[in-house]
Amino acid sequence: MPPAQSSVAASTKSSEEEFAVGRVLSVGKGTLNKELLSSVGMVSNRQIVSVEVLEGKLKGCTVAVPNEITDNPVFNINVKPGTEVILSVVTTGGEVAKSEVNIADYHRAPALGWLLLVFLLAFVIFGGKKGVKSLVALLISVCLIAFVLLPLSLNGFNPLMVAIGICLASAVTTMYFVAGLSKKALAAILGTICGVIVAGVAAQLVIFYAPLTGLSSEEAQILRGSVLVASPKFYSGLLAAGMLIGALGVIMDVAVSIASAVSEVAKIGHRTFAELYESGMNVGRDIMGTMTNTLILAYTGSALPLLLLISQIPSTKLVNLDLVATEVASAISGSLGLVLT
């Protein structure tokens, strides 16, 4: 089949973009892009890459696609024969033969799919029946976020209020699948609810009094610049919702661990409420240190590039930066909810 043209003539007709998987067949020798160098001062070598389109309207076609390799690795997509990539295919006026094709990104789905498969197998093999139930609970939590939190937030609902509801629903669902209908599950649910409420209140207070805008991240700024949501209050609520959901996992972990430990102690022999309470407090103190470390280190790990970037900034300015204050508030609010679970 003859190669499809990878450029499209100027037209006033409407354009339609789709994304398709392609496989690199060959990579031409790079040549210096003098136009880009003279206009913006960026050193770029332009390659002509021959790509076979594996799906979509151009399936089976071989297209010649320009690929820019610049002096900034952020923008580079380095390919070789056999590399699978995601192609952006722009069709104007339904003229498929004149579609504009560009390399949008690497095709990462297969690697992620294999990683997910290994995770699921490990969960089922070592977790058994309870592991399968836990996976179902996890799937429900993901669906609640994807099909409830995101749509409602985009439709103007307060993200924090929606997140609290989702956290409670997720806690009840998870505890039911993990512990069934039992006193242990009820105790874990109540503990999780207390932790979630405390974390939510702490997050809202620090956002109000600091104050934090919720616009410190690049993603939030892009969302603010779009036509999706314009209200500034939305982003502070979105920040609080993110803090809450980020802490939910460890809060549930602590609640289940303490409830399970106290339940096992109660089975050994008759124990008074005071003795069981003391046992639960002792277990909670032991767990509190490790789980707080888990939460703080998780936020620290995700912010390592930020920490390197700001390491030379004076401490007075550092602590008061919106971006830094947001990360600190997220970690401490979640830890406070964990401690009071």
Where are these regions (language model features)?
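Transmembrane alpha-helical segments that form the functional core of multipass membrane systems
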Residues: 117-225, 236-246
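Hydrophobic secretory-pathway targeting helix
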Residues: 1-11
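Extended, hydrophilic extramembrane loops/domains of integral membrane proteins
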Residues: 71-110
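Generic detector of multi-pass transmembrane helix bundles and their immediately adjacent loops
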Residues: 200-335
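Extracytoplasmic
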Residues: 19, 46-48, 60, 80, ...
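Structural detector for short beta-strands of small beta-barrel domains
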Residues: 14-45, 85
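Short, structured beta-strand/loop micro-motifs enriched in basic residues and often containing a Trp
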Residues: 62-70
